[in-house]
Curated annotation (Swiss-Prot):
This is UPF0336 protein SAV_4901. Coiled coil: none annotated. HAMAP family: UPF0336 (MF_00799). Belongs to the UPF0336 family. One of its GO terms (molecular function) is (3R)-hydroxyacyl-[acyl-carrier-protein] dehydratase activity. Pfam families: FAS1_DH_region (PF13452). InterPro entries: FAS1-like_DH_region (IPR039569), HadA-like (IPR016709), HotDog_dom_sf (IPR029069), UPF0336/Enoyl-CoA_hydratase (IPR050965). CDD domains: R_hydratase_like. GO terms for biological process: fatty acid biosynthetic process. It comes from Streptomyces avermitilis (strain ATCC 31267 / DSM 46492 / JCM 5070 / NBRC 14893 / NCIMB 12804 / NRRL 8165 / MA-4680).
Amino acid sequence: MALDQSFVGRSYPPTDPYEVGREKIREFAEAVGDPNPVYTDPEAAKALGYADVIAPPTFVFAITFKAAGQVVQDPQLGLDYSRVVHGDQKFAYTRPVRAGDRLTVTSTIESIKSLAGNDVVDVRGEVHDEAGEHVVTAITKLVARAAEEG
């Protein structure tokens, strides 16, 4: 059953602050196989004009996808989580994520489409630091696969 289009534009409360730590950045860079020293060496980061190490571009996926869970778990929307897969991801940065940042995410349903019986929901996650400054916008595409005919 197609999702209700009236949910387009609905925003959810900001998440609790997520504190970005050097160790989390290092672990993420290691996990994705990116040896760039700007992610692990404060001196390398400072040489490029950053106050501390910065995170790889996809690092924020962990917090924006978790925040998109507010949409998935909204009982009024009626999205069947057991059928949801991640379809696509885009990021638009104002500045890099840095060690020491305390980030919040505000999720908004950007669009709802029905394609071949699948529900496709785009969720915009606006990421801000503790001072309220914009850091990155993440667009997460969620696909709820059509129910199998029995």
